[in-house]
Amino acid sequence: MRIQQSALLLLLLAVTSQGDAESNWNDKIKVFTVATEPTDGYTRYIRSARVYDIEVTTLGLGEEWKGGDMQKPGGGFKLNLLREAIAPYKNEPETIILFTDSYDVIITTTLDEIFEKFKESGAKILFSAEKYCWPDKSLANDYPEVEGKASRFLNSGAFIGYAPQVFALLVDPIEDTADDQLYFTKIFLDETKRAKLGLKLDVQSRLFQNLHGAKNDVKLKVDLESNQGVLQNVDFMTTPSIIHGNGLSKVDLNAYGNYLARTFNGVCLLCQENLLDLEETNLPVISLALMVTQPVPFFDQFLEGIESLNYPKEKLHLLIYSNVAFHDDDIKSFVNKHAKEYATAKFALSTDELDERQGRQLALDKARLHQSDYIFFVDADAHIDDGEVLRELLRLNKQFVAPIFSKHKELWSNFWGALSEGGYYARSHDYVDIVKRELIGMFNVPHVTSIYLVKKTAFDAISFKHKEFDPDMAMCESLRNAGIFMYASNLRIFGHLVNADDFNTTVTRPDFYTLFSNEIDWTEKYIHPNYSLQLNESNKIQQPCPDVYWFQIVSDAFCDDLVAIMEAHNGWSDGSNNDNRLEGGYEAVPTRDIHMKQVGLERLYLKFLQMFVRPLQERAFTGYFHNPPRALMNFMVRYRPDEQPSLRPHHDSSTYTINIAMNRAGIDYQGGGCRFIRYNCSVTDTKKGWMLMHPGRLTHYHEGLLVTNGTRYIMISFIDP
């Protein structure tokens, strides 16, 4: 029994001693990286280390980069910095050196796990491995063979090893501009040196994952509740601890990085970090650049959104660029009205003959001239619905950040989640969830357009020139190449995109024609602001006469635009019984009118009846349901003393009729109104934008009262004839 107890005690002591030793090893891991500038990539790397309590020593910060062009072979400068930094540990066999790049690396686990994976490899020095032999492809056949889909070739972006061996690895001199990967490759391919130093490659990506050429080898697994992600190598079912976006894989790394290193924990943690505290007495100076590069509907509402910005205008330098003659007059009127409110206010119109690239460059140059802290680009298709958008973007404290805007009921938005091989749009795995706000946060994306805020530290990186790409795509490519992250936030709904497809500026009042493509904006502009209140059962419906209901339905803009459309068309009927627009060619109760079919608005008006008239009808006439409403006759009537001043008594060929007043009684005309003969009840004080709704045939025999002066317009529909 004592022997068993003694053996058990020895075993416990051994386990404890081993655990202490491993803990000591963990304490002696020294992590190094090289970064001469605190780029967005470096900030991300340091954050990923911090969340796993990893202390990193950064070499070269604030120094001039001497390693040559980062897009070409080079990087010996890194090794010279590292050699000097680890020299104090060269005789410490228990010290472990972990080196990684920083601008394109993310750490995803603790040092404990990193140490365990290194120990399991059996190497003295373990390098990351990749799919391509670079920079000297001729050396590929000299590498040892690997099995299956393993990565065969050394990558210098990350390695780990015992300090004496790592120092010995770096003992040979290298020029600052020589290639670090080639330096390590030649040592690895020397079998004698490889054996002496205990060099191995992490060919199955147990510790390190290089992404270039490995897109199909990895899968991002995201927990549906927390939104925390891990990157798995599906070929070997490993979960690498250090992810390196080498070569052309940086866009992929950015996409994965949105979920790695605890950026989420049910909510977006990244969105809560390093926020800017806005001091009202010292707010940043902003250049507000409005870009009008195509004809867009609801331009007046776009300008209203700009005016709604909750930011001191004396801190805003306004520039409006337009290459669209259709909008020039509105721009001039806006600037003339508001110029004195802004720090400066200028415009460049279509007559200045600047193309879009020149217009955007002009805005950026003006921002430099004004020494602005930021430039806020807003294209005319981006409608701001929340005036806090600028302040909220500033608080996120990024070099480049955009609110996510999308078209109503569409997946079309102002960002791309991924790129095709040619640099164009590709749909990312999370794009739909982000646009629908089923996933809420701030995301590093490869392309943004329409509305974005840029910090002055990124101004010099921006180029709008490109042989193939439009200015927005050129800008995004230049920012990607400079390592500046483009963040897109859907933390709040700040606005939306209007749909400018098929916007026809050749028709009168073209906004009116866009109900199907821009339902939100059309409703906001053309439906009465009190409309929805009338759908509440507690809201009492006005009845000026028995079973004649009175509703606020459309805005002044609806009335004015529709009257303008009709008058521009000018195809008023002659008021006789002969009417070739009707089947049979005969009108029993003729009026001077224009049918909606004549101005291309029949389909739109039927949709208007379904969306806005039908819900009111169902409130007024309980128990009658007919969806969609059917109306063969939708027309505007014009009454004038010298044309047709009144209308004789008649029944309408409808189940119910609507009559919308299109202008102002007592101001635009005198007299007029409608008399319901059976009830001897008249409505003469009609109100612009208000609708009378009454039964058609049988009960509501009525007449149009005499207009004595001016012109009266009404919009009539005979519904469900």
Swiss-Prot record:
Gene3D superfamilies linked: q2cbj1_9rhob like domain
A GO cellular component entry from the record: extracellular space
GO MF terms, alphabetically ordered: iron ion binding; L-ascorbic acid binding; procollagen galactosyltransferase activity; procollagen glucosyltransferase activity; procollagen-lysine 5-dioxygenase activity
SMART domains reported for this sequence: P4Hc (SM00702)
Positions annotated to bind 2-oxoglutarate: 712
Subcellular location: Endoplasmic reticulum; Secreted, Extracellular space
Principal place of residence: endoplasmic reticulum
Function: Forms hydroxylysine residues in collagen type IV. Required for the secretion of collagen type IV (vkg) from haemocytes, fat body and follicle cells.
Protein name per UniProt: Procollagen-lysine,2-oxoglutarate 5-dioxygenase
Cofactor remark: Binds 1 Fe(2+) ion per subunit.
UniProt KW keywords: Dioxygenase, Endoplasmic reticulum, Glycoprotein, Iron, Metal-binding, Oxidoreductase, Secreted, Signal, Vitamin C
Cofactor list: L-ascorbate; Fe(2+)
Catalytic activity: L-lysyl-[collagen] + 2-oxoglutarate + O2 = (5R)-5-hydroxy-L-lysyl-[collagen] + succinate + CO2
